[in-house]
Amino acid sequence: MIWVAVIITMLLFILVAKPTGIYLEKAFQGSKTLDKVFGPFEKLIFKITGVKAYNQTWKQYALSLVLLNGFMIVVVYFIFRLQGVLPLNPAHIEGMEPTLAFNTAISFMADTNLQHYSGENGLSYLSQLIGITFLMFAAPATTLALVMAFIRGLAGKELGNFFVDFTRALTRVFLPIAFIAALVFVALGVPQTLDGAVTAQTIEGAKQSILRGPVASFVSIKELGNNGGGFFGANSTHPFENPGQMSNILQMMLMMLLPTALPFTYGRMVGNKKQGRILFVSLFMVFLLGFITITTSELNGNPALNGMGIEHVQGSTEGKEVRFGTVFSSLYATVTTAAETGAVNTMHDTLTPIGGLVPLVNMMLNTVYGGVGAGFVNIIMYAIIAVFISGLMVGRTPEFLGKKIEGKEMKLIAVTILFHPLLILGFSALALSTNLGTDAISHSGFHGLTQVVYEYTSSAANNGSGFEGLGDNTPFWNITTGLVMFLGRYFSLITMLAVAASLKEKTVVPETVGTFRTDNSLFGGIFIGTIVIVGALTFFPMLVLGPIAEFLTLK
C-alpha cells in the first residue's frame, strides 16, 4: 500500500507541473491571469512606490535586485537584534546575538533558511511574521522574477523590469497559492494563532508548556517558496508543522510545484515546448535515481545493527517519525534537497551513509530541479555546457536556441560552474584547519567530515538543511556560512543573467541538417551525462572521503 501512495504522489508531481508552467508563462508574459483581482492592487503598489514599467538592461536589473535585497537584509537584521523591546513577544525572547542575526537575515533573504537557532525559542512572533515570513515571500519572488528575465533574454526579448516582475511574483503566484495552502493546513490540524503558549497537564500530573503560533501560514510559504526554515526547531518532524501523511504529501507537492513547472514555462516562452519537456523528463529520471538509492539504503538498515542480529523490518528508523515511515521519509529527503527547500521530516544526520549521500549530491548538483528560479538558471547552464561539449566533439560552433555560444558566454559559465565547488570545498577546508571549525563536530572520522561539508554545501546551494549533530551556533559558523549563502545566492544569478543578455543581442542562425537538436532524447542523455561528469565528479574525492568511506567501514 505504501508504494501505491508513493506512485500517486509522484504522479501528482507530474500532473500539476505543466498547468502550473502554463500559468507562470501567462502571468509573466502579460496575458490575463486574475487581472480583475490583482490588477488594481498592483497598480496601487506601483503608484505608491513610484515604479515605472520600463525595460531594464541586465546591469540595471541585477542592481535593482541586489539593492532591494540588501535593504531587506538590513531592516530584518535590526528587527532580530531589537525583538526583545518590540511588541508581539509574549514569551519575552531577547534580541539575537549579532553574528546570529547576521546569519539569519542573510539565510532567509538568500532563500536558504539555514537555522542556527530554535524557532520557537529564538524568535518572537513579530520576528517570525515581519522578519521571517516576509523574507519567505520576498526571497523566492526575487529569483522567480530573475528567472523570467533570464528566459526572456534567451528568447531574444527585452529582460523586463525587476520591480514589476517581483510584484507579479508576489501577487500572481506566492500570495494566492500560499493563502489557499495555509487554509488546507489549518484543516489538517496545523495551528494558526497569535496566542502565547498553553499550559497542559500530562497524565503523570506534571505541567507542560506547549508552544504554538501562526504556523499554518508559515508552513505554506515555507514549502511553496522552497524556503524550508521551521517555525519550530524540529522543523517538519514537529506534529504542529506536519501532523500526518496528508500534510506530508501536501508539503512535498508545494516544494516541487514551481521547480517542476519552470521547464514547461521555459519551453513556451522560447518557442520550443519539446525542449522544455526533455529537460523535465531528464531531471525526473535523475530525481527517481536518487529516490531509489536513498530508499534502498534506508530499507536495508544500519550495517552496524545488522551485524548484531537486530531485525530491521522497517529499515533504519533512527531519526525518523513513525507516522511517516522509512519510505516517505526517504522521499521527503529526496524532494527537499532536489527542490533545494531544506525542510526535513527526518534527521538527515541519522541517515545511513549512502542515504545521506543522496541529499548531499542533490545539493552539490543544485540542478535537480533546484529551488525556485535559481535552480532553473543552473539547469540552463548545464544545458549550454552540454551543447558546447557536443559542438566540440563534431567540430561545429555550438548553438543554443539558434544562437552561437562563443567565448564570452563560456567564460562566464566556466567561472559560475567553478564558483559553487570553490565555495563548498574552500570553506570546508578552512573549517577543518582551525579549532573554531572542528570544535563543532560531534563525530570523529568520516562522518565528521561529512557534517562539515554538508553544512557548507547546504549554504552554497541555498538549501538550509543540515547534519544537526554539528554545533554550528558560534561566531565562526555564523559568519562563514552567512558569507557562503550570500555569495552562493547572488553570484550565479548575476553571471547567468549576463549570459542571457549576451545571447539576446545575437542573431538567430538558420537551422540546417547539421544543427545539433536540443529537443530529443539524445540531447537528454548528453544533458544528464554533463550533469554527472561536470557536476558530480567535481565533488567525487570528497564523497569518497566522507559518506562512501563511512559506508565501506561501517560494520
From Swiss-Prot:
Molecular function via GO: P-type potassium transmembrane transporter activity; potassium ion binding
Membrane association type: Multi-pass membrane protein
UniProt keyword Protein biosynthesis present: no
Domain of life: Bacteria
Xref: InterPro entries: KdpA
Pfam families xref list: KdpA
An example Gene Ontology CC term for this record: plasma membrane
Transmembrane feature ranges: 2-22, 60-80, 130-150, 173-193, 246-266, 278-298, 374-394, 412-432, 483-503, 525-545
Keywords assigned: Cell membrane, Ion transport, Membrane, Potassium, Potassium transport, Transmembrane, Transmembrane helix, Transport
GO biological process, any: potassium ion transmembrane transport
Location(s), subcellular: Cell membrane
Stated role: Part of the high-affinity ATP-driven potassium transport (or Kdp) system, which catalyzes the hydrolysis of ATP coupled with the electrogenic transport of potassium into the cytoplasm. This subunit binds the extracellular potassium ions and delivers the ions to the membrane domain of KdpB through an intramembrane tunnel.
Family as reported in the entry's similarity comment: Belongs to the KdpA family.
Subunit structure: The system is composed of three essential subunits: KdpA, KdpB and KdpC.
Protein name: Potassium-transporting ATPase potassium-binding subunit
Taxonomic source organism: Bacillus cereus (strain ATCC 14579 / DSM 31 / CCUG 7414 / JCM 2152 / NBRC 15305 / NCIMB 9373 / NCTC 2599 / NRRL B-3711)
Encoding gene (name): kdpA
